[in-house]
């Protein structure tokens, strides 16, 4: 990515990759027991993955040359609410367990269903938008959106399958999902970024309107 000129799109791609790397790093720290307490690493990891869905939605809008509006604003708003909850609520994350292939997190019962709806909901929205917009666009935008959609499906399909087959794996959904996120990271780096560099139209930026 260092070869490419930084645009709104490449900044979003870099942000997604950094957050994925942060979560992978926190898993290593949790199970390696380095420096910080496990609860601190859990909060850092959950904070990182909570910010991923709105960034993906925002990226889809820019790749499709759509102006980010209420949907993107709502995605960011919901992510900030969950981010604040996991960062500051005392009992939001009470512990973790390390397994061979993933980590489970003990989260407050009241947050499990809302957070699952939040995460899967925005992933489905992103998949739907990329599927709906891609066929109507020229080749570079189409290729980038289809690559992003493939990345979404790489998260949704394996994770959903695992949790259906092994109900006890539900607590490990964030860890399992980010295990498959290497596919998304590869697509962002090798396909979405190169295709986005070929785009000629001006990208829409995203700004919140202040009431003053």
Per-range role (PLM):
Residues 24-28, 59, 63, 129-133, ...:
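Hydrophobic membrane-targeting alpha-helices
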Residues 95-105:
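Membrane-interface helix termini and inter-helical loops of multi-pass transporters
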Residues 1-5, 61-71, 129-146, 193-206:
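Juxtamembrane membrane-water interface segments of multi-pass membrane proteins
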Residues 26, 140-212:
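Interfacial "cap-and-anchor" motif at the non-cytosolic start of specific transmembrane alpha-helices
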Residues 4-92, 106-125, 152, 170-184:
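Individual alpha-helical transmembrane segments in multi-pass integral membrane proteins
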